[in-house]
Amino acid sequence: MAAYLLAVAILFCIQGWPSGTVQGQVMPFMEVFKRSVCQTRETLVPVLEEHPSEIADLFKPSCATVLRCGGCCSDESLACTAVGKRSVGREILRVDPRKGTSKIEVMQFTEHTDCECRPRSRSGVDSGKRKRNPEEGEPRAKFPFV
């Protein structure tokens, strides 16, 4: 048994870990650079961030994956910004705790299609957060009682 475990350990050292890099290996500069540039990347977006008026219901999952712009620009005065967008549908389970009902429905999310490094807003910080309309009320608690 000990010989088997030793063989498996040696095999991992020779072939590398499943991620494709040997544990402790340094990622080459070009790979780091390629992964860090301003581009669309899969991002988890909370359902209530896209649909803030739907606070009375619960959603499963509570977030969905969409492509969003992210990454670094060559200058601190620039921010990675979406220049192309589209609407995409995701199937989400909506639970109405008042009625005790649930149903799977298609909800629309904004997905970024193209990104560019553009000058940051005048405030100097581009938070990317959407401003809440006063008529929408207060946001729902993060851990509602169910």
From Swiss-Prot:
One of its GO terms (molecular function) is growth factor activity. The keyword Transmembrane does not apply. Residues 116-146 are annotated as: Disordered. Pfam families: PDGF. One of its GO terms (biological process) is positive regulation of angiogenesis. Residues 133-146 have a biased composition (Basic and acidic residues). It is found in: Secreted. It comes from the Eukaryota. Belongs to the PDGF/VEGF growth factor family. Snake venom VEGF subfamily. Homodimer; disulfide-linked. This is Vascular endothelial growth factor isoform GtVF. It comes from Gloydius tsushimaensis.
